[in-house]
A protein has these predicted regions:
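Active-site loop/oxyanion-hole signature of alpha/beta-hydrolase fold enzymes
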Residues: 67-68, 75, 115-152
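Flexible "cap/lid" loop of the alpha/beta hydrolase fold
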Residues: 176-220
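Catalytic histidine-centered segment of alpha/beta-hydrolase-like enzymes
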Residues: 362-370
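Conserved loop-alpha-helix segment in the C-terminal half of the alpha/beta-hydrolase fold
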Residues: 314-361
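Active-site nucleophile elbow and catalytic-triad environment of alpha/beta-hydrolase enzymes
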Residues: 287-305
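Conserved HGGG/HGGXW glycine-rich cap/lid loop of the alpha/beta-hydrolase fold
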Residues: 70, 76-120
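Conserved hydrolase catalytic core segment
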Residues: 147-191
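Alpha/beta-hydrolase fold catalytic core
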Residues: 2-84, 106-108, 146-147, 338-345, ...
Length: 384
């Protein structure tokens, strides 16, 4: 027979240690969740504050209308020193210089210009050549800035800055060339470069009748060969499938994948596909097509142009990619703007007034990856 419970039986004790463990786990889960929210927010909005920062630094977006009706869009900073003209690289706009503009604006009067086919400037293919663009920017310098300038150009903007310096030396104090594709854009050499193959994608897309360039790019870009060098499925897993899934859920939008931080530059790859033709951006793919068929280079002799430059200049040139240690991939395709021999040739053609700063540990965008190096180069030219 079971004994009845005695009156003095104590109630079962709860386990405070177990409860504390549960609380700690709950807090950890909450913190991880909050961390993921902040992580995703940063990855999705890392560039959303650009305009506010530029306005805070005193920049205003303006437009100049040329006698023939063409429009040059530009960002102008406060008048805090010598005039400085900045010419961006291809597929972006003047805001691409945002990482260095606030600092430069403290001691220069900055004019960051969208050249034709980009940003808010005219989209007239008749103007898509080095000679036409450099002529009109020279007009802008003479008619609007009205004083000699320091001029710097990135990538194809560096080609333009060099041509302007050669053509109107009375309106230029000095030149900074940022990783410009000298000689590698010439017919016979260009076909073995990553850049030319990218322009071929633009040409082929325009001829295809398809409506979404980002999707076309995902299927055809030579970039997938670089990604798949060690893993044949890397491009699909890392880039293509996440992008296609995003575009399925957000039709007409450029992919922005929440789990990729800006340092990996995967979302930057997507951003560079934004274009006027499919209404995702302001870049005119017909501009890139002129690099594919070489019409952009009509009457532009790169060697002769460099020889004609008499102003002080600095050439900034990046080091080979750290992954491969070479400017070329395993198929002999140039994956950079120039190799070391090209940079040395530019340096020699520019003569004794040129300084070559080589092997900069940076991607193609030195002003973003190494802003201090870029700003110091501008300051050095200003001291001449």
């Amino acid at each position: 027979m079971n004994k009845p419970f005695s009156d003095n039986t104590k109630p079962t004790k709860k386990h405070p240690q177990r409860r504390r463990i549960v609380y700690i786990i709950a807090i950890i889960i909450a913190l991880v969740g909050i961390g993921l929210v902040f992580y995703a927010h940063r990855n999705l909005t890392y560039d959303h504050g650009t305009q506010a920062k530029l306005q805070q630094a005193g920049f205003q977006e303006k437009q100049a209308k040329l006698p023939d009706g063409s429009v040059l869009n530009y960002g102008e900073g406060p008048a805090n020193g010598l005039a400085l003209v900045l010419l961006h690289g291809q597929q972006v706009s003047w805001e691409d210089y945002a990482p260095v503009l606030p600092e430069l604006a403290k001691r220069y009067h900055v004019y960051a210009i969208d050249y034709y086919g980009h940003g808010g400037s005219s989209k007239n293919p008749m103007k898509y050549s080095a000679t036409a663009i450099s002529t009109d920017i020279s007009w802008f310098i003479r008619q609007h800035i009205k004083q000699p300038v320091i001029i710097s150009g990135h990538s194809s903007g560096g080609l333009l800055a060099s041509l302007i310096t050669a053509n109107v030396p009375d309106m230029v104090r000095g030149l900074v060339i940022e990783d410009a594709p000298f000689f590698t854009t010439e017919k016979g050499r260009a076909e073995s470069t990553f850049s030319w193959r990218s322009f071929k994608d633009m040409h082929d897309f325009l001829a295809s009748g398809q409506s979404n360039f980002t999707q076309y790019w995902l299927d055809h870009t030579y970039m997938q060969t670089l990604f798949n060098a060690k893993d044949p499925n890397a491009w699909d897993k890392i880039v293509k499938q996440p992008a296609l899934q995003y575009m399925k859920q957000h039709p007409g939008k450029i992919p922005r994948i929440w789990y990729y931080p800006p340092e990996l530059q995967v979302n930057t790859l997507f951003d560079l596909t934004a274009n006027m033709q499919d209404k995702t951006g302001e870049y005119d793919l017909r501009f890139g097509q002129t690099f594919y068929n070489f019409s952009w280079f009509n009457e532009f002799d790169q060697t002769a142009t460099l020889k004609r430059i008499t102003k002080p200049s600095i050439l900034l040139h990046v080091a080979p990619p750290t992954q491969s240690g070479s400017y070329y991939d395993e198929h002999g395709v140039l994956a950079s703007a120039m190799d070391d021999k090209d940079a040395q040739r530019v340096h020699e053609l520019l003569g004794s007034k040129n300084k070559l700063i080589d092997n900069i540990k940076s991607s193609h965008d030195i002003h973003k990856d190494q802003p201090k190096v870029f700003i110091e180069a501008i300051d050095e030219i200003a001291r001449h």
